UniProtKB/Swiss-Prot annotation:
L-glutamate binds at residues 267-268, 324, 330, 342, 363. This is Glutamine synthetase. It is an enzyme of class 6 (ligase). Gene3D superfamilies: Glutamine synthetase, N-terminal domain, Glutamine synthetase/guanido kinase, catalytic domain. SMART domains: Gln-synt_C. It holds the Pfam family Gln-synt_N. Oligomer of 12 subunits arranged in the form of two hexagons. Mg(2+) 2 binds at residues 134, 215, 223. ATP binds at residues 210, 274-276, 342, 347, 356. It comes from Picosynechococcus sp. (strain ATCC 27264 / PCC 7002 / PR-6) (Agmenellum quadruplicatum). GO terms for cellular component: cytoplasm; membrane. The modification O-AMP-tyrosine is found at residue 401. Coiled coil: none annotated. The activity of this enzyme could be controlled by adenylation under conditions of abundant glutamine.
Amino acid sequence: MTQTATDVLRLIQEENIQIIDLKFVDLPGIWQHCSFYQDQLDEASFVDGVPFDGSSIRGWKAINESDMAMVPDPTTAWIDPFCKEKTLSLICSIKEPRTGEWYSRDPRSIAQKAVDYLAASGIGDTAYFGPEAEFFVFDDVRFDQTENKGFYYVDSVEGRWNSGRKEPGGNLAHKPGYKQGYFPVPPTDTLQDMRTEMLLTMAKCGVPIEKHHHEVATGGQNELGFRFATLLKAADYLMTYKYVIKNVARKYGRTVTFMPKPLFNDNGSGMHTHQSLWKEGQPLFWGDRYANLSQLALHYIGGILKHAPALLAFSNPSTNSYKRLVPGFEAPVNLAYSQGNRSASVRIPLSGPNPKAKRLEFRCPDATANPYLAFAAMLCAGIDGIKNAIDPGDPLDVDIYDLTPEELSKIPSTPASLEAALEALQQDHDFLTAGGVFTTDFIENWIEYKLDAEVNPLRLRPHPYEFALYYDC
């Protein structure tokens, strides 16, 4: 594991690495990259950065002020297993070359500011995050949208809808039923070997691996697990996780999506996010209150629940996100907390008498989120809850899905759409700008980008199901 620029440069020489691939994340959360011959990187590159044109990166600079610099983090080095020539990957943050300051719209720099804000607050010195991102593996995906047509088509050999089709060599059955895909062994689980390769490849890329398994939905839903890490490192790991999973699937002739709801009438894919605070090596969430939580932890939960509608603009930032957040598909739609209750939006996992394992799990997020922004926003909400002693109310230790409409009406719910979440963010973002983590400019730019690039274009287009509903009017 490299720690310094000197370590990286030594590794390049010792391993005879020819190509250096610098990766950074754009505003929506997609990795971008540029590859350099090995002699283009030196000690100064890790301080001043490597220049590039930022005008074509979504949500960033205008063309008349486009000079940017990628600053590689030497602790993120790994040899890319998908490149033909030996290639060293480094994850970068972005600097403004003219000022030498970190770029205020760079998601990774924002995540670092959140970490610094926690330390400056005196509350704690370490925030641990553990995301669990689910995904689908499909065999065939087609979609198109033009003036006279709009459709999507996805298929999977595991799809229950294929139980009656003719297949080469015969239909061998063993296709998971709807909501029956959790933990079956092969031959029902056709993806065992692929997931194993994904997991072991992640380890080669420096991600601390734990497990893999099939998930609930039919049609190839899966999850791999990696160990929790500090906020910035957890976001780096998640980006690597997605990169590895997509590329291993491509080797197998398959394709992966982290879309929250690619299939109608079955469970969607979430990104449950575990989190805890520590100070001087001691866990801060363990205590003598409800579920062995500390008062500080309850206030952290209070901050998450209070700001959840605005938080979802970052943790669930797609129009598709809100097709997952509906009742009946194991997705939390009500803003409550509970011990062990997976129908609550904040769950306190049963961790036994181990103080170091005490944590909370925010169950709303999905993997369309930019992890740097989502984790930073969650931490800011938690800090605000602690600073202002926000009471989370009483826990809800019943199955929320079994409550009557009258009982449910008393529980706050998640926004019903991305537009509603963006409106909540517009009204509630002081907790994000506290400590200089997010800037007002960034928040305004995020809202504008999401409306212009996603919400409004979707509003303009007829939906295929509208033809089923209204064509014969």
